[in-house]
Amino acid sequence: ERWQKIALAAAKQSERVYLPTLSGPESFESAVHCFRQTYPNATLLYGDPEGQWLEPGAHSPERRDWIVCIGPEGGFSKEELALLRVLNAQPVRVNPHILRIETAAVAFTAVLSLYEHLTDAR
């Protein structure tokens, strides 16, 4: 409940149209499959310092939803990476350095916001 109040306050402050829904912890596999079912047309990305930079126009215009997976401090496990590959997740770099989770989430949000702005401008 506390986190939902924080999400509501943040959404109001940033004048967001939608309110994010928060849920309790799940296994990585369960969470990824749940997101895939809920958003079947979403582009699935994961943070990877060796991944590609997002290029404006590189994705289909009808795919406007994003699922972003940010790994733990030590990186994704081999099993998690295998699952991401099976699900056709794209490794994406948002910074030339490895970021902490708090910073990575903000960086991904900023990069995707800019990406959508540049794609819409085309």
Regions found by a protein language model. Name each.
Residues 17, 64, 87:
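Structured loop/turn residues at beta-strand edges in well-structured enzyme cores
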